[in-house]
């Protein structure tokens, strides 16, 4: 919300300077983002009047003007297309200094003397208009200092409001806050009801009362929209960063800024029959005021006539029903559209308007009539015309209702760490427009006004007290609690421990958004319907992630684009999966790796990381809680992973994650020019381990046997190891695969697996007969179950 300081001080003017006011607003939770001067730095500019003009003798586009400053007449050469006798303009006299250290001196233009300069808005930095002179009203006082005339010793203050403070998106709301902060009186403009000068009306039907509980309309005839908007209004709009369009649009924008109620003016001649507020028909077309044609969805509320949609309710009007300079009769709309009905609709159509910004945050449902009367009065004053009666349709059952709140002094003391005087509590809350009455000893009954839709609980009232009293004035009180130590399950590994493990293995932690681009969701999950947000932050953050990979890969791309060739990232967070019984939110831990296996160094090679390097990292995570033997890696399929480098990770038959290389087609789509490996694990499964069992170290020698086995190339090494474990007996202490070979001397459909087995008995030495017998059992089982034989 951006506004003029002088406009605000017209409502409430505490005896403090600008800096103090800005600081107090920020401390009260209305954070001031910027304070900018209302105009550039200039001096020596007065209100001038062009008395006469004549053609320059040597230049077709220049005019020689006689300009008065109220006391003298000066000859000025000007090339502006709109210069003419009788025009009043900003006149920079000799010696004036304009923005950019530009000094006005006597000069000759094509041989004709020029004593000053006639100025445009852009030259004085009071607007963007540079296609001609700034035209002042006919009643402008010639000779008056231009800065004084336009009250340019002003500033535009921009306040960054949190979404719950929609009540401050107006001068009325801001003035109410300032008045409460400084205990200063607030002078609200007196809005008089405009009597009807004719009886013409248009019928209003609200077919979606839950979305539009209140709708007001009024016919205003014989307006003259060719009349200019008064300069005082144009300036207030400009200082609020609102561009002047025409009188009707400017007035609706002005009232919106002043009171907080969005309004809309329709060209009455373009309305067929009456007004119908309804839900759009699926695929219904509407060309908006910005020229964009949209295809409406059935969940969009529209204002329509009897034949077509006229506007997206609370967002933007249609082009064909908008007012123009030729409009003679206007239908003025002032409505209360439900917050939920409007929320997200603007963004879903790629729009963001001042009206939607306010409706999404909440508009005072009792404000519509006052705003209608205020806009009508201004419209008649500026453009002429006659107003008809107000037509109002209300659905009382759908209007918001706020129940009274009980506020306890004990709770205030508990939360703020101090006792607050009862009179002070009542004064602060009354200053905000809340009705406070004592309700027994040490408590109050508080009625919340319609403009404070963010207050519904006792803690909300206490927050208001803290804001107005001043956070910086609250005493420091440390919390006291009796905390007993919590027993930790020894068979679990906490997330912080897993984080430290991955950091120790060369990873860096990343935090990415849970919202992703639906297009990116489709790349990682082709054919799967994404979970779309009803009110996304932006179109490229409209889907909930079903995996942590999209965010991690995006972070990887960001680093690769900045010459980081070795990237190892991990993240822990929720994934969101739609199920028949509802949304499943599951904590996951995932990683992405690319680049060299080891950091660059003189004694280290530059080998590129591969699948088995990442598998080793995953095994370290899986084994951290002591349950690595419960996990298995099996060949798997995943649409985002390389079909030949993908493993499904299982725990006792349950799928707990995936590991693999990014699919080549996906890499191409993402612009990745090197191998990228990823893993993702269900955090609950990873964290759950088992208690280790301790045994006395054996003092007897180990016995080792190495077996070279021939198996079909499609037989997984894990399957071979599982069969060996099942038949190796209880004294097997170590089993490892140390070589895999395919090539010369072995059939093309076979491969050689070399495994090492180590046995050790805790209380005696194993003899060869025992080991040989066990080895033979292993070989027999391998041949029977996997057709794997000893290599000869």
Curated annotation (Swiss-Prot):
One of its GO terms (molecular function) is magnesium ion binding. Residues 39-147 form the tRNA-binding domain. The keyword Protein biosynthesis applies. Its cofactor is Mg(2+). Pfam families: B3_4, B5, FDX-ACB, tRNA_bind, tRNA_synthFbeta. Belongs to the phenylalanyl-tRNA synthetase beta subunit family. Type 1 subfamily. This is Phenylalanine--tRNA ligase beta subunit. It comes from Pseudomonas fluorescens (strain Pf0-1).
């Amino acid at each position: 919300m951006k506004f003029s300081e002088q406009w605000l001080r017209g409502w409430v003017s505490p005896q403090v300077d600008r800096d103090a006011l800005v600081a107090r607003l920020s401390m009260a939770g209305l954070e001031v983002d910027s304070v900018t001067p209302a105009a550039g730095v200039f001096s020596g500019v007065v209100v001038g009047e062009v008395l006469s003009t004549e053609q320059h003798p040597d230049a077709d586009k220049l005019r020689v003007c006689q300009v008065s400053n109220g006391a003298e007449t000066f000859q000025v050469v000007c090339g502006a297309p709109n210069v003419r006798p009788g025009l009043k303009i900003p006149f920079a006299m000799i010696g004036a200094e304009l923005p950019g250290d530009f000094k006005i001196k006597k000069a000759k233009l094509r041989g004709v003397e020029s004593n000053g300069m006639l100025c445009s808005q852009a030259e004085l930095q009071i607007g963007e208009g540079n296609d001609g002179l700034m035209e002042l009203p006919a009643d402008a006082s010639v000779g008056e200092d231009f800065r004084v005339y336009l009250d340019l010793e002003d500033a535009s203050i921009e306040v960054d409001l949190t979404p719950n403070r929609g009540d401050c998106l107006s001068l009325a709301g801001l003035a109410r806050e300032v008045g409460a902060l400084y205990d200063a009186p607030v002078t609200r403009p007196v809005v008089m009801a405009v009597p009807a000068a004719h009886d013409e009306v248009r019928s209003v039907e609200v077919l979606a009362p839950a979305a539009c509980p209140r709708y007001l309309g009024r016919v205003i005839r014989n307006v003259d929209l060719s009349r200019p908007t008064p300069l005082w209004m144009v300036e207030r709009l400009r200082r609020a960063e609102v561009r002047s369009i025409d009188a009707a649009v400017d007035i609706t924008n002005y009232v919106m800024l002043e009171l907080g109620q969005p309004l809309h003016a329709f060209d009455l001649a373009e309305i067929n029959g009456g007004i119908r507020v309804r839900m759009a028909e699926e695929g219904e077309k509407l060309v908006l005021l910005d020229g964009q044609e949209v295809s409406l969805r059935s969940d969009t509320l529209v204002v329509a006539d009897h034949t077509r949609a006229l506007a997206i309710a609370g967002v933007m009007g249609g082009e064909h029903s908008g007012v123009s300079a030729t409009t003679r009769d206007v239908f003025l709309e002032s409505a209360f559209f439900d917050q939920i009905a409007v929320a997200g609709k603007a963004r879903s159509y790629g729009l963001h308007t001042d009206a939607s910004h306010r409706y999404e945050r909440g508009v005072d449902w009792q404000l519509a009539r006052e705003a209608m009367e205020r806009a009508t009065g201004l419209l008649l004053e500026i453009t002429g015309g006659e107003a008809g009666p107000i037509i109002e349709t209300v659905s009382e059952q759908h209007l918001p209702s706020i129940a009274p709140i009980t506020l306890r002094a004990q709770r205030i003391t508990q939360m703020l760490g101090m006792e607050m005087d009862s009179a002070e509590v009542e004064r602060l809350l009354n200053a905000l427009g809340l009705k406070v009455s004592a309700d027994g000893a040490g408590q109050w009954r508080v009625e919340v006004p319609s403009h404070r839709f963010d207050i519904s609980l006792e803690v909300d009232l206490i927050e208001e007290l803290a804001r107005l009293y001043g956070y910086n004035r609250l005493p420091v009180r440390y919390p006291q609690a009796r905390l007993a130590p919590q027993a930790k399950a020894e068979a679990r590994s906490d997330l912080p421990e897993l984080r430290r493990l991955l950091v120790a293995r060369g990873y860096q932690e990343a935090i990415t958004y849970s919202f992703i681009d639906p297009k990116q969701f489709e790349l990682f999950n082709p054919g799967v319907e994404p979970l779309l947000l009803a009110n996304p932050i932006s179109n490229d953050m409209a889907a909930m992630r079903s995996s942590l990979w999209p965010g991690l890969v995006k972070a990887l791309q960001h680093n690769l684009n900045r010459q980081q060739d070795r990237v190892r990232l991990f993240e822990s967070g929720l994934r969101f999966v739609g199920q028949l019984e509802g949304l499943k939110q599951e904590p996951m831990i995932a990683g992405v790796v690319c680049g060299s296996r080891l950091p660059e160094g003189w004694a280290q090679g530059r080998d590129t990381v591969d699948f088995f390097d990442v598998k080793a990292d995953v095994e370290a995570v899986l084994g951290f809680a002591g349950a690595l033997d419960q996990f298995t890696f099996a060949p798997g399929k995943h649409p985002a992973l390389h079909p030949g480098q993908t493993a499904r990770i299982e725990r006792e038959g349950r799928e707990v994650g995936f590991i693999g290389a990014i699919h080549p087609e996906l890499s191409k789509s993402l612009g990745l020019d090197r191998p990228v490996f990823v893993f993702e694990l269900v955090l609950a499964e990873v964290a759950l381990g088992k208690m280790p069992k301790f045994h006395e170290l054996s003092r007897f020698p180990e016995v080792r046997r190495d077996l070279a086995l021939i198996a079909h190339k499609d037989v997984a090494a894990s399957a071979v190891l599982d069969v060996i474990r099942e038949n190796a007996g209880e004294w097997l202490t170590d089993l490892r695969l140390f070589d895999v070979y395919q090539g010369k001397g072995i059939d093309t459909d076979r491969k050689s697996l070399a495994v090492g087995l180590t046995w050790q008995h805790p209380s005696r030495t194993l003899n060869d007969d025992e080991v040989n017998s066990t080895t033979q059992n292993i070989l027999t089982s391998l041949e029977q179950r996997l057709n794997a034989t000893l290599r000869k």
